[in-house]
Amino acid sequence: MYDITKWKHMFKLDPAKSISDENLEALCMSNTDAIIIGGTDDVTEDNVIHLMSRVRRYPLPLVLEVSNVESVMPGFDFYFIPTVMNSKDTKYHNEILLEALKKYGHVINFDEVFFEGYVVLNANSKVAKITKAYTQLGIEDVEAYAQMAEELYRFPIMYVEYSGTYGDVDKVKAIANMLQHTQLFYGGGITNIDKANEMSNIADTIVVGDIIYNDIKKALKTVKIKESNK
């Protein structure tokens, strides 16, 4: 069994986006700790299973981040279930989880399932608009969400999502300082090794996504943070 708490770097692949076999191999053989498959929209059973079968050729952990019940399937090492804590829509708190449990609860291995407490902080992102996330949060707000995630909900993971833009370092630091047991994931705007280094010194784990599709060489360089975080 893989130990998620030791992961420092992950690549996130969107099943709705195309990626060449060459680039996929480069990602999977790059020494990243894991591949996450997940997206905000146009995530279907067909495109998830297609991408999963391609990644499965390589010997590294594979995670499905569940965004709808229809795309859930066996074959992943772990399943991450996001709950958007700053969403105004209860669908993104627990309704998707409820539907998943009704359909698959009798066959789920709960050792493979991890709840993620998401805080979405880029107001202009697609995920913020779809989830109706309230993003105008100050330091005290994000500290309270961190406390909520760790002390009350006892989430194993808190995910700070800036989705497409680089985050406010002070806010991410404030969240990190509140967490002792909950693992902090950071995703958003990591487009080069300098940003990867900066965020990897704050968060436990960084998630690199969009840059994969814009500049694969820059994406691959972000894995170098593991050398300085040994």
UniProtKB/Swiss-Prot annotation:
Enzyme superclass (EC): transferase
Gene Ontology biological-process entries: glycerophospholipid biosynthetic process
GO molecular function per UniProt: heptaprenylglyceryl phosphate synthase activity; magnesium ion binding
SUPFAM superfamilies assigned to the protein according to its UniProt record, in alphabetical order: FMN-linked oxidoreductases
Pathway: Membrane lipid metabolism; glycerophospholipid metabolism
KW Calcium (keyword) present: no
Reactions accelerated catalytically: sn-glycerol 1-phosphate + all-trans-heptaprenyl diphosphate = 3-heptaprenyl-sn-glycero-1-phosphate + diphosphate
Known EC number: 2.5.1.n9
Subunit structure, interactors included: Homodimer.
Function per UniProt: Prenyltransferase that catalyzes in vivo the transfer of the heptaprenyl moiety of heptaprenyl pyrophosphate (HepPP; 35 carbon atoms) to the C3 hydroxyl of sn-glycerol-1-phosphate (G1P), producing heptaprenylglyceryl phosphate (HepGP). This reaction is an ether-bond-formation step in the biosynthesis of archaea-type G1P-based membrane lipids found in Bacillales.
Entry similarity comment: Belongs to the GGGP/HepGP synthase family. Group I subfamily.
Protein name: Heptaprenylglyceryl phosphate synthase
Gene: pcrB
